[in-house]
Amino acid sequence: MRKLSLFILTCLLFISISCSESNQTISLITYNIRLDIESDVINKWDNRKEGLISLIKEENPDVLGIQEALPNQIEYISNQLEDYNMIGEGRDGGDNGEYSAIYYKSGKIRLEKTETFWLSESPEIPSIGWDAALNRITTVGVFSEVSSNKKFIVYNSHFDHIGKIARENSVNVILNHIRENNHIKNRIIVMGDFNASPNDSPIRLLSSEFDDPYINFPIKNPFGTFNGFELDSKSMERIDYIFTSNLKVVDYRHIYKRLPNNLWPSDHIPIFISVNL
């Protein structure tokens, strides 16, 4: 009887471990943090940065993709998020220009490979694509979850705000990168500020290639992600997204949180997602 009990306990432990590994969950946030610019006056970075960090720490994502971060903002965020490592470079090359950086929890997530490419006809070098106003980049991180060793790939991007053709072609640059690197069968997250509404062609193309969790986790009005620092915004544009492939999404939400003084931490709303690997 004692041997039988030990056998049953061993089986139950094995099943428990197997289930835990098969349902390993990670969380991610995409967040355009708004660049540091004095013309924002009351909404300038120095007035927002502490509250923005508090929001991130409260949500506690395993992976954080940010857009529009200048080098001084990257330095501040990196110093505040001590449990995270950062990958990415400025859109003008090296430490220059805005980052579309990815932060990841070093104790839970292992970095396997990273690269940055430009959304242009010459993705390997700093460059402006098509009718874009500015250099635009995508940061790629190939990661594995430490306890399960399960691999996943994150694309964090910021599309141009002016160039319609550039936004359309930016999707194809990302899709080509996925195909050329044989990522198509892997667990993929594509996220960022795409400066496009759901009915625009770039988002329709992304929705045809990936899953849009928003569909299965409806957001009550205001359903958008761009508040423009407007305090009474009732109907925000949805221009920030998280798309997934080969992943089960268990939670998706927009984080409508304000600072103690009732101002927004950024002119964009962060998006939170939780997935089973």
Regions picked out by a protein language model, each given a short descriptive name:
Residues 65-67, 88-89, 189-193, 212-215:
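Active-site neighborhood of phospho(di)ester-bond hydrolases with catalytic His/Asp-centered motifs
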Residues 2-5, 16-80, 91-97, 172, ...:
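N-terminal, active-site-proximal structural segment of metallo-dependent hydrolase catalytic domains
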Residues 108, 165, 169, 176-188, ...:
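Metal-dependent phosphoester-hydrolase catalytic domains
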Residues 30-50, 119-133, 160, 227, ...:
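Acidic/histidine-rich helix-loop elements
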Residues 32-33, 157-159, 193-194, 269:
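Active-site metal-binding loops of divalent metal-dependent hydrolases
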Residues 26, 62-63, 152, 187-189, ...:
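Short, Asp-centered acidic motifs that coordinate Mg2+ and/or phosphate
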Residues 35-42, 66, 112, 164, ...:
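Short, solvent-exposed loop/turn elements at domain surfaces
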Residues 63-151, 155, 254-255:
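Structured beta-strand-rich core segments of catalytic domains in phosphoester-bond hydrolases
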